[in-house]
């Protein structure tokens, strides 16, 4: 269980930072369409509402769901993210700013032949995250930076029994995160990623009752 949980937590942070395939010098609608296309290509099924006001496009009640598989075992399941509001702002200088909420709830459900079924609820958090898109339609550059990005465990359910909060603690923290992603359209769409992490820490403590 620890293996798939740790890998999914880290992958969730990286996917949400690096898969923002935005387009500059185009409309906010095209920026959102690019993000939605990239997330769909990553395996997510997406539903959301759209509201426009001036240069601001707001995506409300964004729900993202995809299947996950632990490559080291037979464990598989689903991961769901719920984003209350995602905003795209045209800065008027050929760049687009993407604004994410400070906290995004994530739910992971796993079926494991070895460990049984379990559900994990945690929050994807960020502090002072800035995402800026620029470039041209056939070569898109997006830069991002944050003081911190993390995942905090909120609930753990094993075989339909919730583990008391006092008995389970887990978090993953990335400090001083920055990076660049360039999307170039040639015959296919190619991505070049550069992710810098000042410090990463992961800790977990789980106390489970023994058999009665």
Q: Where are the language model's segments positioned?
A:
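Bacterial N-terminal signal peptides that target proteins for export
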Residues: 1-9
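Bacterial N-terminal signal peptides
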Residues: 8-18
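Sec/Tat signal peptide C-region and signal peptidase I cleavage site
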Residues: 19-24
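Glycine-rich, small/hydroxylated-residue low-complexity segments
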Residues: 26-212
């Amino acid at each position: 269980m620890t293996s798939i949980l740790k890998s999914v937590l880290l992958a969730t942070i990286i996917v949400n930072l690096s898969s923002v395939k935005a387009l500059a010098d185009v409309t906010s609608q095209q920026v959102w369409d690019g993000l939605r296309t990239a997330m769909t290509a990553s395996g997510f099924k997406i539903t959301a509402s759209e509201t426009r006001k001036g240069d601001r496009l707001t995506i409300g009640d964004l729900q993202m769901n995809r299947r996950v598989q632990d490559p080291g075992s037979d464990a598989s399941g689903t991961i769901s993210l719920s984003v209350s509001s995602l905003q795209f702002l045209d800065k008027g200088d050929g760049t687009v700013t993407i604004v994410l909420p400070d906290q995004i709830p994530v739910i992971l459900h796993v079926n494991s032949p070895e460990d049984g079924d379990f559900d994990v609820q945690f929050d994807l958090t960020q502090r002072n995250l800035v995402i800026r898109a620029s470039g041209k339609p056939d070569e898109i550059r997006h830069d991002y930076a944050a003081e911190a990005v993390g995942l905090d465990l909120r609930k753990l359910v094993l075989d339909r029994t919730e583990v008391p909060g006092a008995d389970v603690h887990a978090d993953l923290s990335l400090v001083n995160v920055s990076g660049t992603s360039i999307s170039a359209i040639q015959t296919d769409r190619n991505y070049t990623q550069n992710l810098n992490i000042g410090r990463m820490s992961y800790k977990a403590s789980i106390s489970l009752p023994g058999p009665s």
